[in-house]
């Protein structure tokens, strides 16, 4: 059974969960996972303040986020192996700087999906926001490897400063799609 983290109720203030990494939680007890500090506005609070936690990632190397996590940022950031499934919507920076593994979102994802990604696979069954696979502001390299699949629509500036990898959008894409210029 995977480790399941269920959002009790949607928050209006974003919760940043970059401290909840699959590589770390598969070695931790449920109580340790519940006490993991996450950023909520300008303070750090235990994960258990917003989420119910059950199961274990020790055997499956799988982490499941349940609920409308559209205000939950940095799910799967820096993922290197294993599988993350979001049963619902995902917030900004999904899979940012990941180097391996797989992330599946059954709903929509906000901006910066796969930002500065180095490898792995991200699939969003709904729509994605702006700057999919892009470099962060001031950065020089966006996505350098990996695969991002968006079944629905995606916003503006897809693949900004992207070097390698593949981004496929099944629906409509916004403005300023970045692509390599061909020599004349």
State the predicted function of each range.
Residues 1-184:
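Long, distal/terminal scaffolding or interaction modules
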């Amino acid at each position: 059974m995977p480790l399941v983290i269920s959002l009790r109720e949607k928050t209006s203030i974003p919760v940043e969960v970059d401290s909840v990494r699959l590589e770390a939680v598969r070695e931790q007890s449920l109580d340790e996972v519940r006490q993991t500090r996450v950023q909520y506005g300008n303070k750090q609070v235990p994960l258990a303040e917003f989420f119910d936690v059950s199961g274990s990632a020790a055997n499956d190397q799988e982490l499941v986020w349940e609920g409308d996590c559209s205000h939950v940022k940095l799910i799967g950031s820096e993922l290197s192996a294993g599988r993350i499934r979001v049963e619902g919507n995902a917030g900004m920076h999904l899979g940012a700087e990941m180097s391996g593994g797989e992330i599946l979102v059954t709903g929509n994802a906000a901006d910066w999906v796969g930002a500065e990604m180095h490898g792995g696979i991200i699939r969003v069954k709904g729509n994605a926001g702006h700057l999919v696979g892009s470099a962060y502001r001031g950065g020089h390299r966006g996505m350098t490897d990996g695969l991002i699949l968006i079944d629905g629509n995606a916003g503006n500036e897809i693949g900004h400063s992207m070097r390698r990898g593949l981004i496929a959008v099944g629906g409509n894409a916004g403005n300023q799609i970045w692509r390599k210029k061909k020599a004349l």
